[in-house]
């Protein structure tokens, strides 16, 4: 769980520079998140959701929490990567929807993120 908390702090830094032109720092933070989660972006984008959950579970049953970090990373990366933005947003939305259905805890934050991403995809 310490890893998830630390990665949450990295994600918060990425959120803080969302509209900043410091792409070097954002790219470094994004790489840190994917590397720490032991997955690369291509795998995360192409893997089916159940396989992604199993890969991220890492034996501690925190796969859903790591999936949520991946989804939020993809959302933030979409602001810095216009070429892959649509694919990143689509997968982030799919992941969050999967988590919302699979998790025992209902999350208003997830619902709002899903709506936010849907609006971004419709613009």
In which residue ranges do the predicted regions lie?
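Amphipathic alpha-helical binding modules
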Residues: 81-123
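N-terminal alpha-helical interaction modules that lie
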Residues: 1-64, 94-98, 119-123
């Amino acid at each position: 769980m310490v890893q998830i908390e630390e990665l949450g702090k990295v994600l918060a830094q990425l959120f803080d520079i969302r509209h900043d032109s410091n792409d070097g720092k954002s790219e470094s933070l994004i790489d840190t998140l994917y590397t720490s989660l032991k997955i690369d972006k291509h795998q995360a984008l192409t893997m089916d959701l159940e396989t992604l959950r199993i890969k991220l579970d890492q034996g501690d049953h925190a796969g859903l929490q790591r999936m949520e970090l991946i989804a939020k990373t993809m959302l933030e990366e979409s602001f810095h990567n216009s070429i892959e933005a649509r694919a990143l947003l689509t997968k982030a939305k799919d992941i969050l929807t999967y988590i919302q259905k699979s998790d025992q805890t209902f999350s208003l934050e997830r619902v709002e993120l899903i709506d936010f991403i849907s609006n971004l995809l419709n613009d």
